[in-house]
């Protein structure tokens, strides 16, 4: 058994760690609330844009934009949104596992793939994973702007426009609630057709000034908005996962302190008993 002094030092060390994890939990909780506000503010726009584009994809247009045409998938692109920092449980690991499984299924069909990682952890993973990394972004902070992502997204759009990509997906952690964050893969291109019940009534739009000018701008903005929504959802998921992880670490530290305190008390009791035995033995000898 370790000496009482060593155990006492260990207890002090664990208490210091507990203070750090408790502070990180509170910081993550505060950041999560702000991230939720940003996510809630951008979600209606992203969902409305997705709905409109879904109906456009179902419509009977004279001008068929390349983003509406389904072609054989020879090369697949992924925009993978992960975190810049760690200490957020299995958030990134679960996301990467989902991407790897999807890549494997495409690989079995003979398709090649390339990546556009967003977030330092995503960049680090995919540079060592294999496959081409066409563009990347990191250090976006807790309140990213759409302008921070446009350059990175355009690289993948240009590749699609040039026929270098036949499918484009965005991958991120969808925020469900504080305890649940789900990794999702959403198709960006070609445009997925709406699954809305209203699709049975088919919406046909009248375009001003003309379909080509409008769709060329609208469809690019659609892709950018979906990637941005994925980023803000992932940030909210990150802060929620970090808050939960730090709370678990704080609770575990408390349990460890209690266990060490018990060991310390036993060691101190044994030391006192030993000293008393030596005193009694010495007195008997005299």
Swiss-Prot record:
Gene Ontology terms for molecular function: ATP binding; proton-transporting ATP synthase activity, rotational mechanism
GO biological processes: proton motive force-driven plasma membrane ATP synthesis
Chain's role: Produces ATP from ADP in the presence of a proton gradient across the membrane. The gamma chain is believed to be important in regulating ATPase activity and the flow of protons through the CF(0) complex.
Annotated compartments: Cell inner membrane
Organism field: Shewanella sp. (strain MR-4)
Domain of life the protein comes from: Bacteria
Presence of the UniProt keyword Amino-acid biosynthesis in the record: no
GO CC list: plasma membrane; proton-transporting ATP synthase complex
TM helices/strands, residue ranges: none
InterPro entries to which the protein is assigned, alphabetical: ATP_synth_F1_ATPase_gsu, ATP_synth_F1_gsu, ATP_synth_F1_gsu_CS
Membrane topology: Peripheral membrane protein
Keyword annotations of the record: ATP synthesis, Cell inner membrane, Cell membrane, CF(1), Hydrogen ion transport, Ion transport, Membrane, Transport
Subunit structure: F-type ATPases have 2 components, CF(1) - the catalytic core - and CF(0) - the membrane proton channel. CF(1) has five subunits: alpha(3), beta(3), gamma(1), delta(1), epsilon(1). CF(0) has three main subunits: a, b and c.
Protein's UniProt name: ATP synthase gamma chain
């Amino acid at each position: 058994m370790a000496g009482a002094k060593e155990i006492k030092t260990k207890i002090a060390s664990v208490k210091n760690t507990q203070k750090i994890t408790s502070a990180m939990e509170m910081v993550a909780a505060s950041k999560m609330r702000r991230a939720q506000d940003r996510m809630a503010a951008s979600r209606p726009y992203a969902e409305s844009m997705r709905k409109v584009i879904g109906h456009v994809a179902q419509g009977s247009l004279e001008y068929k934009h390349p983003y509406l045409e389904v072609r054989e998938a020879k090369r697949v692109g992924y925009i993978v949104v992960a975190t810049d920092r760690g200490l957020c449980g299995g958030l990134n690991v679960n996301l990467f596992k989902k991407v790897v499984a999807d890549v494997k299924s495409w690989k079995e069909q003979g398709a090649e793939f390339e990546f556009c990682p967003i977030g330092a952890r995503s960049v680090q993973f995919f540079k060592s994973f294999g496959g081409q990394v066409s563009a990347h972004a990191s250090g976006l902070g807790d309140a990213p702007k759409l302008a921070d992502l446009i350059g990175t997204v355009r690289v993948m759009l240009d590749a699609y426009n040039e026929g270098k990509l036949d499918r484009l997906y965005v991958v991120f952690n969808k925020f469900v609630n504080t305890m649940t964050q789900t990794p999702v893969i959403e198709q960006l291109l070609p445009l997925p057709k709406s699954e809305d019940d209203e699709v049975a009534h088919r919406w046909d739009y009248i375009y001003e000034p003309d379909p080509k000018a409008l769709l060329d701008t609208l469809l690019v903005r659609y892709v950018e908005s979906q990637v941005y929504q994925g980023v803000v959802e992932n940030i909210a998921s990150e802060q929620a996962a970090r808050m939960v992880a730090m709370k678990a670490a704080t609770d575990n530290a408390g349990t460890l302190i209690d266990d060490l305190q018990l060991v310390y008390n036993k060691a101190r009791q044994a030391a006192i008993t030993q000293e008393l035995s030596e005193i009694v033995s010495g007195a008997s000898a005299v």
